[in-house]
């Protein structure tokens, strides 16, 4: 509803038949008052929402009421001090721990009833129902992976639970246990780690991490903004050509593979990392790293000199790395261990460079590796939106194959961001590349014209991922001596044709599932490859 004379919106509601998950009804009401100069100031705001998990069931009615008072346009020392801070939202330390008496005395609208201020009571009542209680627990473990050691202010989280049981060709069955501390134990000092054991190779692996935060944290170490110094040591297996960006390699949902997972060696790595994030969206990381890669019977290191192959058990690099990132107005969903982007409306720029010198701190090779990337979401009004990710990189020196650029292959049947669903691990070797990942979400633009599909609220997806790469002669063991021979017979350098795969999919199946069917368009004559396949993932959206 809009006042004609004042030309301002007073209230707004969503149609009941809108293609929106979980929300059956929504009403927004706002009241304004005029300042002395005629400016309209928001005085009162009320948002009413009725949530429903499924049709035909009772929903949850929620109402949020906010009142705004004490506007002032007179400059004050307190205001100058507040606006000088870089934070967009300033939250006092004690804001979340005020007693009930404080709010009773200071809440500006006495008309707010007890029912409108009883979220805690509502949640307690809901958790009294076994279905809701166990659904909340299961979803929490699925999406965060961690179990708190207590209901209130847990000192320690156990997990990730979805990485407890896994396996691969080198290790056989693998068990893993770990956890991390929280700010309730110490708001500045955080610990994290795990221990794992493979029953086939009978080797113990693990990670130990200690991080000092210069900023006081509320719950977790990775809360924005991060300003920390982290010491980390890890000894584990290296799954060549596989790098899962938003989940652990031990995730049980990745256990079922479309091909044998046998491109695996070992590594030991010590890192010291300084991280600083700014409210402007700019951040940087400085890392000093000592890494040793060890061969295995699956991935032998055989140094080639003419026709002679000499076994090498391991090699080491001592490197420094600088990462720059600029993501203005970025929004993300934060879990205990990771961040998942929820808004890519503003572009995200990344730039990194890694450098190592032969003989410096025991490094066996000179190594320079540069990476750059940009990602952006483009909206097309009622026609949906497109997420675009572009990346490029180059290795500048002559190095063995583990230090080359291996495209990120996804061997599981799940949908994984920035990976190739039909490429085999170590299928291609490059020392320079350019890649793209384009996904078009139509938001029901086509399906909404079909009555049954509109009722199901299914939504269409079209995707295209590709990579153009090149391997120079100096890094090709077939053309240059002193390198490790490629351990996999099917490994090749890319030709002039880029690798391309496309997919069509449906999301919002049962409101939580996404299904894609993917086709491989190029290099279809390669032995042992999948030319097409069905992929699935959990994808909850409104």
Language-model-derived ranges and their functions:
Residues 1-9:
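Single conserved hydrophobic/aromatic residue that forms the stacking wall/gate
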Residues 2, 69, 130-134:
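Compositionally biased, intrinsically disordered low-complexity regions enriched in proline and serine
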Residues 9, 85-542:
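Exposed, low-structure sequence patches enriched in small/polar residues
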Residues 11-75:
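Acidic, serine/threonine-rich low-complexity disordered tracts
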Residues 67-91:
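Cleavable N-terminal export/targeting peptides
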């Amino acid at each position: 509803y809009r006042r004609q004379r004042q030309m301002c919106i007073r209230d707004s509601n969503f149609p009941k038949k809108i293609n929106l998950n979980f929300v059956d009804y929504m009403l927004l009401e706002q009241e304004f008052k005029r300042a002395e100069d005629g400016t309209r100031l928001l005085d009162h705001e009320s948002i009413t929402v009725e949530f429903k998990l499924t049709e035909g069931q009772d929903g949850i009615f929620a109402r949020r009421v906010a009142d705004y008072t004490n506007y002032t346009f007179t400059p004050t020392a307190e205001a100058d001090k507040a606006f000088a801070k870089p934070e967009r939202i300033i939250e006092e330390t004690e804001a979340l721990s005020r007693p009930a008496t404080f709010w009773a005395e200071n809440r500006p609208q006495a008309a707010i009833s007890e029912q409108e201020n009883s979220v805690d009571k509502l949640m307690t009542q809901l958790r009294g129902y076994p279905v809701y209680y166990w659904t909340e627990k299961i979803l929490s473990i699925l999406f965060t992976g961690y179990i708190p050691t207590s209901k209130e202010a847990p000192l320690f989280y156990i997990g990730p639970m979805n990485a407890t049981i896994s396996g691969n060709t080198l290790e056989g069955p693998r068990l893993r246990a770990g956890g991390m501390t929280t700010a309730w134990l110490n708001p500045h000092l955080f610990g994290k780690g795990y221990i794992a054991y493979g029953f086939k190779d009978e080797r113990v692996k693990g990670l130990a991490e200690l991080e000092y935060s210069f900023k006081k944290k509320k719950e977790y170490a990775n809360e924005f903004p991060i300003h920390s110094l982290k010491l980390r040591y890890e000894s584990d297996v290296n799954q060549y050509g596989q790098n899962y960006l938003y989940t652990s390699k031990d995730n049980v949902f990745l256990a079922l593979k479309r091909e044998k997972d046998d491109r695996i060696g070992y590594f030991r790595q010590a890192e010291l990392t300084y991280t600083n994030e700014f409210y402007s969206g700019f951040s940087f990381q400085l890392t000093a790293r000592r890494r040793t890669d060890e061969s295995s019977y699956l991935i032998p290191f055989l140094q080639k000199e003419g026709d002679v192959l000499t076994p090498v058990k391991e090699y080491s690099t001592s490197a420094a790395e600088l990462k720059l990132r600029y993501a203005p107005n970025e929004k993300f969903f934060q879990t205990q261990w990771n961040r998942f982007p929820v808004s890519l409306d503003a572009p995200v720029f990344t730039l990194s460079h890694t450098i190592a010198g032969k003989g410096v701190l025991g490094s066996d090779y000179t190594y320079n590796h540069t990476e750059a990337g940009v990602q952006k979401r483009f909206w097309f009004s009622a026609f949906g939106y497109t997420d675009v990710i572009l990346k490029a990189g180059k290795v500048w020196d002559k190095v063995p194959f583990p230090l080359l650029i291996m495209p990120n292959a996804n061997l599981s049947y799940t949908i994984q961001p920035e990976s190739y669903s039909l490429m085999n691990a170590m299928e291609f070797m490059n020392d320079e590349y350019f890649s793209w990942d384009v996904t078009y979400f139509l938001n029901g633009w086509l399906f909404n014209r079909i009555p049954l599909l509109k009722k199901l609220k299914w939504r269409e997806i079209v995707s295209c991922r590709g990579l153009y790469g090149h391997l120079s002669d100096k890094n090709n063991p077939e053309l240059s001596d002193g390198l490790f021979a490629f351990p996999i017979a099917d490994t090749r350098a890319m030709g002039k044709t880029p690798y391309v795969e496309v997919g069509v999919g449906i999301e919002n199946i049962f409101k939580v599932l996404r299904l894609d069917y993917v086709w491989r368009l190029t290099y279809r004559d390669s032995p042992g490859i999948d030319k097409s396949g069905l992929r699935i993932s959990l994808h909850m959206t409104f």
